[in-house]
């Protein structure tokens, strides 16, 4: 994981602007502690903080075209870069082995209309010095964070995290996933569109002769295999839940051979390391241990105490840049775990984010009234992932210079999984959620894991973690403070004391209105969208993101 920051639309280059860009970049150096690079020329400044994963020796950034007329700063991984390189063999002169350099080749060939060619996670800024134009773009789902801003002088700012823009420009906002901004057009435009974003009554998408479980199995194994490309040690996050267990089992299947040689040579680090964190005796730790023993990873179990978690919250909110209750709850143990992972020399981990959104894994999905409602909710959840789980996974890990990859959100896998008939994914009543995913990988996991009920990460690390947070924040925030919450926080007024507590810390770090508006604030039950609250009358009086809020479904419901 890297960090990018910079300024466009510069009329006259100055030392002051260059120093400003340097200060912006320093704010996100935790994302890329290995090297710093900067371009300053024409009407642009591009800064890059590097975490070296692919081609550590020559892949420093910014990257330049062979004639140095185009310059590029990227935070991301392009998983199909070898295929693209092959297409441009003899047509484009590559200077490095960096996976991201293919963006320059594509731009030189196709102009700005090349983004669909990429399969990867990315946020980038490209400056064409010859044309004095620039292009900013973000990956389809928003796995990689990106923000865009402006000032009164007409400068356009960009940064991997909002802390790179806070105090440096007049206003900013999250850069939308699946969008690009081209200086000639002057507005953000969508580049990523799919037929599955709209529900179709007549399911004409099942042309594939393979069973749904076989389609899922093949597509996910291919996604994990693609995402194992690395020139540095890597591992897997293994919570003991279904999603991380599936990813870990597939990764273990391919870990012994080097992906970059198509399995022709042994892997540089053939032992796959898995990592789990929780309070002592937490449900996740017990299950993670069972999975690790079954699939054969070198497993590392990290315990943290309630006090250690509480002590970290202020730092966690600074790094993850949100006051969303669910995200803070889940980010804290992940932040603590990332520190241990980095201390062991691991720079990249695979994680299980995205499966619940794709397959309707959150427990409230049991209440979906029909296939249309179910499918439309999965699409809504995917469209908001950049504000929640993607943000958590990326920034919690990046705080310690660790990159997170998410195979469930692989572009090709999404097209397979989201085109399945939603009836196949539904789990009415007591039917277990994500049944099609469980069936696809049941033979790779212990039975007790393959058919284990969904636990949200913040629950699975230990129920007392959430219970303690509720208790502490209920005491720390008075009834009078809550009564006047709208006066103190007119933008996205906190809906409960826990949110008020996190919001107060967030405001200390990021006092601007832009920062406040960058965080979503909606009623939710078990991580639902606001629209899904209509599925059950019991949801109307609830605002609790924990899965235990879904009575009649969760085995340990309140």
PLM features per residue range, with description:
Residues 17, 95-99, 118, 209-216, ...:
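Hydrophobic (often cysteine-bearing) scaffold residues that line and stabilize catalytic clefts
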Residues 1-323:
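Cysteine-centered catalytic environments shared across enzyme families
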Residues 314-318, 364-366, 464-467:
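Short low-complexity, flexible loop/linker segments enriched in glycine and/or proline
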Residues 324-328:
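Acceptor-substrate binding/catalytic loop of class I
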Residues 340:
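Adenylate-forming
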Residues 346-356, 362:
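Short acidic/histidine-rich active-site segments
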Residues 1, 8, 343-350, 369, ...:
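Adenosyl-5′-phosphate
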